[in-house]
Amino acid sequence: GVPICGETCTLGTCYTAGCSCSWPVCTRN
C-alpha cells in the first residue's frame, strides 16, 4: 500500500519484486 516502488504500471504490470499494481503506480504493502 505504500507507493515507494518508484515504478508506474499504466500497462498493468510491475517489474519490481514485491510490488503490485495500484493503477497507475506500483505499491508495496
Curated annotation (Swiss-Prot):
Maturation and modification: This is a cyclic peptide.
Q: Disulfide connectivity? A: 5-19, 9-21, 14-26
Domain of life the protein comes from: Eukaryota
For this protein, the record's InterPro entries field holds: Cyclotide, Cyclotide_moebius_CS, Cyclotide_sf
Cite a single Pfam family from the UniProt record.
Cyclotide
What are the UniProt keywords, alphabetically?
Disulfide bond, Knottin, Plant defense
Entry note about domains: The presence of a 'disulfide through disulfide knot' structurally defines this protein as a knottin.
Q: What does this protein do?
A: Probably participates in a plant defense mechanism. Has cytotoxic activity against a variety of drug-resistant and drug-sensitive human tumor cell lines.
- Similarity-based family: Belongs to the cyclotide family. Moebius subfamily.
Protein's UniProt name:
Varv peptide F
- Organism expressing this protein natively: Viola arvensis
List the top taxonomic levels of the source.
Eukaryota, Viridiplantae, Streptophyta, Embryophyta, Tracheophyta
